[in-house]
Curated annotation (Swiss-Prot):
Bias (Low complexity) ranges: 312-325, 713-727, 897-907
Subcellular location: Cell membrane
Coiled-coil regions listed: none
Keyword Chloroplast in annotation: no
Comp. bias intervals (Basic and acidic residues): 300-311, 728-749, 812-822, 842-854, 883-896, 908-917
Gene: P113
Superkingdom classification of source: Eukaryota
Primary localisation category: membrane
Lipidated sites in chain (GPI-anchor amidated asparagine): N945
Organism of origin: Plasmodium falciparum (isolate 3D7)
Name this protein carries in UniProt: Surface protein P113
Length: 969
């Protein structure tokens, strides 16, 4: 079945119109800026939309806005819209129908909206015709499947576009083919590809991506080769003789002692020429005589398929015997040479086609661009696209890269038509060549796999053309095919002072080291171990990245400049050597050194590398850009090493430097290996390198096993320190109590001496100061008592009445005990009298707060009478009063004592007899303890009250009251 010639032209024109309308319009607008879109044919189709703005938390957020624009634009041939903030909109009295409101954003200069839009003639992805190649774009987060109305889907190519991100294009053809080929319908979602296939986390790629697809709906009975369909479009072949000469030159340069085999191949080719002529006579007249010599040679290769399959079987059979017979190396060399020469022939055909295509494009554009530059751009782009032969991809690429629409003095429509026709014919031929190369390559690899263990010396893995055929620095970040067209990077190497400058560390980076001080020993050791692991791992990655940059730089020079087989290891060593020489000597000519090296390598080859001006400029850019990135990586290493050294010094201060023994030795060795460049076989940075220090935690486990007892001792020491501190505090408290008791005993034993000393003026001055302190302390105690009284409004009155009754009962009981004490210790009467006066002063102050003024005056008169007539009785009363006042002070200072007294008062109302008996026993116990001058009551009361501070204050008050009484006497 054949498609008529005029129908083919109509379909081609329709497809060309589709390509013209399938341009994508990329926009970056600010909030408030109006964006106006219009389609001359078809309707608007929003591919993606992302809002990047500052939110209320001062954070940059990324939000998809496809739905907002689609509501206004999809299905219309023109659209006007702008974005604004929600708060500003609420202040407007009338709403603008073209506005899109974003509620999460606040005003900022960083806010912007990124969109990509195209035009579609159809509103669905239903493909009506079979055997017609459709090209269209698919939006981000697509939910509409591609459907073949007649036939099954056959994906020719698929590209993932990210126009606002660092990597703008990614080839996803294989993934889409596996998913969609031979199906009636298929859903292609760019958002799903980014998240699930590529595991992308960057919001730029997730929100700002779309897919371009080339699809054909095929039936079970397919039409023949596409190259026959395109044979109707003629392109004059004026350089056919030159191509034949190039082919012969390439074949002769790669024979390598295989003349006999080549002669056989030539005989076979001559036989096949006859077959080709017979086959061509059976074709239609429309397909006769339209192709040049290049096309005829391609047809020869196509008709040689059966012969090649036969030879491949021979190779397989022979290699099976060769594996067991090592003496037949020459035969392997012949087979290898034969396959290599065939691949070189196809590569020569491909180069000739690119040269011819570049010449035609240069003529179409009135020689605005040199044909070599166009050819170089096409070859680089072809390799970047992984040798995809889809002509539509290169049509769009050339229209954009060469700015064809801006060229003057040309008929734009004719140029577009001719450009598309030339690309379609040439790329179809190149696709056929690529398939033949793939066949030869598979046979070559099969041969290599069968002899690589027995005869590995026959294949050079560093420079083999076939084994390294697919090696290309994809997404290298240093260079791209449109260099000097879409962007013009600097060709100058970075400043020497900046190059030798070390990376500096910031205070924030040192904060992790300074945060170790407040930790205890165990946590500090654990934290230092964790930080050491993190820093060493980060340094390992940085060293690998640095060495990989040298490798990427060498690979880019080979693929974009030299474009011939080249040993990357030797070039990488040379680049590293020149880098360190340049750091030592700023006048060192790095570019000349690389050019000389490539010329020396090229001296033994017949196919020379082309030292065109564009090639040399690309070489300079690669050297400058590569060294710049390497220097930045070195500064990162310097910063990490500074943090590592600071952590090591901190560990030394805590005697934990043993944790760094293994990592220190490793990093020293790593730095030496990373900077070595004398031996090409010792280039460091291979991805296959293994480092035991990171693969296991043996070092940390050993270090932890070396000091488990030390950690236990540290923990025990910490506990002992805490206990010793508490014991010291208790000792200090007991010593303070002992000193207070000693002062009391001395005052009791020597009252007369204290009285004599108090007659001096100095003592009077000191006593005046003590009086002031007593007054302030009494005021504080009164305020505390007032607060306690406020908290106990209902119970204090009853408590005071009971306390008064208890005081009277206690006085009667203490009088009897005091009489016996007078007989035993007559010397202590004076001290007791002093204590009595002190207690009376306190009683007066307290009675004034508790009783009315009349009761207080009566008690004072009774006290004076008792002091005049019964001196002995008053001394006994003072002792009891002291004990009672102590209990009262403690009860007033502590809520617990007051609560106990209140509970006692409440219980006394129920049973007065039991209360009085309990109080008598309590007073008697206190009297016995005071007579023996024992300090245990003070300690027990202190522990019961739970505070040593108030106990010390009460003792201090007693001493001060003694001094006041002495002064009064």
């Amino acid at each position: 079945m054949k498609i008529p010639f005029f129908i083919l032209h109509i379909l081609l024109l329709q497809f060309l119109l589709c390509l013209i309308r399938c341009y994508v319009h990329n926009d970056v607008i600010k909030f408030g800026e109006e964006n106006s879109l219009k389609c001359s044919q078809g309707n608007l189709y929003v591919l993606h939309c992302e809002v990047q703005c500052l939110n209320g938390n001062n954070e940059i957020i990324h939000k998809r806005c496809n739905d907002d624009i689609e509501k206004k634009c999809n299905g219309n041939n023109k659209c006007i819209y702008f974005f604004e903030y929600e708060l500003r909109k609420k202040t407007q009295s009338f709403r603008n129908k073209n506005s899109i409101e974003i509620s999460e954003c606040v005003e900022s200069e960083q806010n912007e909206v990124k969109t990509s839009t195209t035009c579609l003639l159809s509103n669905s992805f239903i493909l009506d015709e079979a055997f017609i190649q459709y090209f269209f774009f698919i939006k981000n987060k697509n939910e509409e499947p591609v459907i073949c109305k007649d036939g099954n889907i056959n994906i020719k190519s698929a590209l993932l576009h990210s126009p606002f991100c660092e990597i703008k294009l990614k080839d996803i053809s294989e993934y889409i083919r596996k998913k969609c080929d031979n199906n009636k319908e298929c859903l292609i979602d760019p958002l799903d590809v980014q998240k699930n296939l590529l595991n992308e986390e960057d919001p730029c790629y997730i929100n700002n991506s779309y897919v371009s697809v080339n699809v054909v709906c095929n039936k079970e009975e397919e039409i023949g080769d596409e190259s026959t369909d395109s044979s109707s479009m003629e392109i004059q072949d004026s350089t056919s003789n030159e191509q034949d000469e190039n082919v012969k030159g390439m074949s002769s340069s790669q024979e390598m002692n295989s003349n006999n085999d080549e002669n056989k191949n030539q005989d076979n080719e001559s036989d096949d020429d006859v077959n080709n002529n017979n086959n061509n006579n059976n074709d239609d007249q429309d397909e006769q005589g339209n192709d040049g010599d290049v096309t005829s040679s391609m047809n020869k290769n196509e008709d040689n398929k059966d012969l090649e399959h036969g030879s491949s079987n021979d190779v397989n059979n022979n290699t099976d015997t060769l594996v067991n017979n090592k003496e037949n190396k020459e035969f392997v060399l012949k087979e290898k040479s034969s396959l290599t020469s065939k691949i070189n022939k196809e590569l020569a055909h491909r180069t000739a086609l690119f040269n011819k295509l570049a010449d035609n494009i240069s003529l179409l554009l009135n020689k605005k661009y040199d044909s070599f530059e166009i050819k170089d751009v096409l070859e680089d782009r072809y390799n970047e696209m992984k040798r995809d032969a889809n002509p539509d991809v290169y049509y769009i690429y050339l229209m954009d890269t060469l700015d064809i629409e801006k060229i003057e003095d040309i008929n734009l429509e004719e140029v577009k038509m001719s450009l598309l026709a030339s690309l379609k014919e040439t790329m179809n031929k190149i696709d056929t060549i690529e398939k033949k190369i793939e066949e030869f390559k598979n046979k070559y690899i099969s041969l290599y796999n069968k002899v690589k263990t027995t005869m590995p010396e026959l294949f050079d893995l560093n420079e083999d053309l076939v084994l390294l055929y697919n090696d290309f620095p994809f997404d290298n970040g240093m260079i791209s095919s449109d260099i000097f067209f879409k962007y013009n990077p600097s060709e100058n190497i970075m400043d020497h002072q900046e190059m030798v400058k070390k990376g500096s560390i910031t205070e924030d980076e040192l904060r992790i080291v300074n945060d170790l001080e407040p930790l205890d020993n165990y946590r500090r050791r654990k934290r230092i171990t964790e930080l050491r692991k993190i820093l060493v791992e980060k340094l390992r990655i940085l060293y690998l990245e640095k060495n990989n940059l040298f490798n990427t730089q060498a690979s880019c020079i080979k693929s974009y400049c030299y474009k011939n087989p080249l040993n990357l290891k030797t070039l990488e060593v040379l680049l590293k050597k020149n880098y360190y020489r340049l750091k030592e000597n700023k006048d060192y000519d790095v570019v000349s050194s690389i050019i000389q090296h490539l010329d020396n390598v090229d001296a033994n080859k017949k196919k020379k590398w082309l030292t065109h001006e564009r090639i040399l400029k690309k070489l300079q850019v690669l050297i400058a850009e590569g060294y710049k990135r390497i220097n930045e990586k070195e500064k990162d290493i310097d910063r990490r090493m500074a943090v590592y050294n600071a952590l090591y010094e901190k560990a030394q201060s805590y005697n934990l430097q043993k944790l760094f023994n293994d990592s220190n030795d490793f990093l020293k060795k790593y730095a030496i290996m990373g900077n070595s460049f004398d031996d090409g076989d010792e280039v460091f940075g291979s991805q296959s390198s293994n480092f035991n220090i990171f693969d296991s935690n043996n070092t940390d486990q050993n270090n932890e096993q070396e000091q488990p007892k030390q950690d236990d001792q540290l923990l025990n020491n910490n506990n002992d320190d805490v206990l010793s501190e508490s014991n010291n505090e208790n000792k200090e408290k007991t010593s303070d109590d002992a000193t207070h008791k000693e002062t009391q005993e001395k005052s009791d034993q020597e009252p007369s001496q204290n009285i004599q000393e108090d007659n001096s003026d100095e003592k009077h001055a000191e006593n005046e100061e003590n009086v002031e302190q007593i007054e302030t302390d009494s005021n504080v105690s009164e305020e505390a008592n007032d607060e306690n009284k406020d908290n106990m409004q209902t119970t204090t009155d009853e408590g005071t009445e009971e306390l008064q009754q208890n005081d009277e009962d206690a006085e009667s009981l203490t009088k009897e005990n005091s009489k016996s004490e007078e007989q035993e210790n007559e010397d202590s009467t004076d001290a007791e009298a002093i204590d009595k006066e002190e207690v009376e002063t306190e009683e007066k102050g307290k009675d004034e707060q508790k009783k009315d003024e009349q009761k207080e005056q009566d008690e004072e008169e009774d006290g004076e009478k008792e002091n005049k007539h019964k001196s002995s009785e008053t001394t006994n009363e003072t002792v009891t009063d002291i004990e009672e006042n102590k209990n009262e002070v403690k009860g007033e200072e502590h809520l617990q004592g007051s609560e106990q007294s209140i509970e006692a008062s409440e219980s006394s109302q129920k049973d007065e007899t039991k209360e009085t008996e309990d109080k008598e026993e309590y007073v008697n116990a206190n009297d016995d303890e005071s007579s023996e001058e024992d300090t245990t009551p003070n300690e027990t009361n202190k522990t019961d009250n739970g505070s040593s501070f108030f106990f010390a204050m009460s003792n201090a008050l007693l001493v001060i009251l003694l001094l006041l009484f002495i002064e009064f006497l």
